[in-house]
Swiss-Prot record:
Listed GO MF terms: copper ion binding
Protein name: Divalent-cation tolerance protein CutA
Keywords: Copper, Cytoplasm, Metal-binding
Annotated organism of origin: Pyrococcus horikoshii (strain ATCC 700860 / DSM 12428 / JCM 9974 / NBRC 100139 / OT-3)
Protein encoded by which gene: cutA
Protein purpose: Involved in resistance toward heavy metals.
Cofactor details (free text): Binds 1 copper ion in the interface between two trimers.
Keyword Cytoplasm among record annotations: yes
Family, as annotated: Belongs to the CutA family.
Length: 102
């Protein structure tokens, strides 16, 4: 299992991408949360509202998921960050495997 973290400029784009990834069975679930982001862009520090997405999936779907997020994402340079999960309860992992691409 892996967790993929990415951010979106608003709820609408986050929900659209997440629902597409769910329908395509590239992820088993997602958690969305609004937050403030501070970052460098074109030589200056910017501040914006963003929606962070925690996506849960299988390790073998990483490359396909990463490419699909790039295709769907509204940002020019989206953060698509993989976090390897070393341990997870067996029932959750079984559910995740059953709910993602066969």
């Amino acid at each position: 299992m892996i967790i993929v973290y990415t951010t979106f400029p608003d709820w609408e784009s986050a929900e659209k991408v997440v629902k597409t990834l769910l329908k395509e069975r590239l992820i088993a679930c997602a958690n969305l949360r609004e937050h403030r982001a501070f970052y460098w862009w074109e030589g200056k520090i910017e501040e914006d509202k963003e929606v962070g997405a925690i996506l849960k999936t299988r390790e073998d779907l990483w490359e396909e998921l990463k490419e699909r997020i790039k295709e769907l994402h509204p940002y020019d340079v989206p953060a698509i960050i993989r976090i390897d999960v070393d341990d997870v309860n067996e029932d959750y992992l079984k559910w995740l495997i059953e709910e993602t691409k066969k």
